[in-house]
């Protein structure tokens, strides 16, 4: 595939996909003339479905997964790219690019990861940087955080990922949890905006993770395998609502910075909340990673309306992970998924977005025992969600694919 194919505008792609279906031979205008057809004039052919159009995008590997975690080893990169090739993902954003601080003379984790991915899989991965919180209690940490961002930009980081460490895991020297909206981080958020580096930010977790830690919890299968994901002890963790409120304060304080609030705004259970936040904050976007099982439980008409309204600010992502084992959105102690399972995982995303199917099994069974219903998005909205929004978000940092030999 050439650079030109990847830069091809949507209109041209639609034409490529639809040409065979819509270009029928033209019948002579005057019947009875030499060579005139004796058959009735052909009827107009219906345009292809959005799913057929999307198949064309997948053939050309145009889709962008904005939310992946892939360990930079030759084996793991190859496994990830094999899956992406099979399902039509051209570019994946690795949110675990690593920190940019050095250990002695050794290159930083970010440099090592980016260098290997660029060498072994050129044009396939975009690397986000992560923050090193060492020295949080030092008086100059705010300046050091900004310096890390500047270094990440110099090294080619396309964006910044903040995990759910803030508010739930990281603590200062006195034992208090670091707050999402701590003023010490404001210079960093501001600098990211100045540099045009988008922020993918994860705060809180599913509402059920604040519920009882027993079989009555609808996410028990997941929680029992991940006890550190349970935050229902109020003596250790803040209410989920407090974390979401802190996130909103950060987004509001930094209108010049683009925040991609992952996992459908970190609150897929509440569509009205997500809708209201997108209305209120033009600098907020959301990805759908690991939350289609939750989104798909809602009334499909309501979900579709939200995607139609905010289609310019919703991004495709999956939380596909490759470390010592592959993870498809979430995982547990069961057998590791196979490459065939990974293909099916992506195909269920296509089914959710591109069909009208009702009551089918979702792609991440460990996340809950329920079914989901599809939302049948039109091709123009699918294009935005699948790749156009990501290209716009990343701008000049979006990779060109190397020319074909």
Would you name each region that the model predicts?
Residues 17-19:
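C-terminal motif of bacterial Sec signal peptides marking the signal peptidase cleavage site
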Residues 21-23:
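Bacterial signal peptide processing site
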Residues 27-123:
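An N-terminally biased module of ancient metal coordination in phosphate/nucleic-acid-related enzymes
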Residues 74, 231, 235, 241-249, ...:
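H/E-rich (His + Asp/Glu) clusters that bind or coordinate divalent metals
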